[in-house]
């Protein structure tokens, strides 16, 4: 599937979880709703690099020296996904949520958390699951990471949400493709079908050449 067709799966009317599932399905992932959020985040990171040729860029201000530093979160920079479950006393435990577990949760934060816990309980545990137990099974790529300041080497803690960052980057790439299509259509009077037939690399190159001559 071409990049433009893949990015057509993005729909701003959908929630972030629904967009992530739609993208993974368009990329050929079988039953993406069954993926854990941690596995899904890592696949989204790989998808982002395949589409944009880059990982997720992180920029932060160093509190020690005041300089801006940047780093790239790439598939190789994160640990592989690992199934997680924490025991809840005897007889059962709590597993990591899947995308399916996150769909159509109650709107209220307390009610939503309670329902999510209920969906992720395995077996018949001797104690009830608590909201804090979710942290023990969280393998998602959301939360603080530490990068080194490029100026003074001091560590900088940066909050990163890979799912959100990937969706924003891919939405930006979709806008770039729309611009490429517009340039080629207005310059050569080609139809959308003709432009689509060029393929992603050729469309991108021709659009760049047109932009350079303007």
Model-inferred region functions:
Residues 1-214:
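Long C-terminal interaction/binding lobes of large macromolecular proteins
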């Amino acid at each position: 599937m071409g990049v433009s067709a893949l990015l057509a799966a993005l729909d701003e009317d959908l929630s972030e979880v629904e967009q992530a599932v739609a993208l993974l399905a368009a990329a050929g992932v079988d039953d993406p709703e069954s993926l854990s959020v941690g596995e899904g985040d890592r696949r989204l990171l790989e998808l982002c690099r395949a589409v944009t040729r880059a990982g997720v860029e992180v920029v932060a201000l160093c509190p020690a020296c005041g300089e801006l530093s940047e780093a790239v979160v790439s598939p190789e920079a994160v640990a592989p996904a690992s199934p997680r479950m924490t025991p809840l006393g005897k007889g059962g435990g709590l597993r990591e949520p899947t995308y399916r577990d996150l769909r159509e949760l109650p709107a209220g934060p307390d009610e939503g958390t309670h329902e999510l816990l209920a969906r992720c309980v395995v077996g018949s545990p001797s104690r009830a699951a608590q909201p804090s137990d979710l942290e023990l099974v969280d393998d998602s790529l959301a939360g603080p990471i530490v990068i080194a300041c490029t100026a003074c080497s001091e560590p900088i803690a940066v909050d990163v949400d890979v799912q959100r960052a990937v969706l924003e980057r891919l939405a930006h790439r979709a806008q770039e493709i729309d611009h490429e299509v517009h340039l080629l259509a207005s310059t050569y009077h080609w139809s959308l079908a003709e432009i689509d037939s060029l393929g992603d690399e050729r469309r991108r190159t021709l659009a760049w050449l047109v932009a350079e001559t303007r």
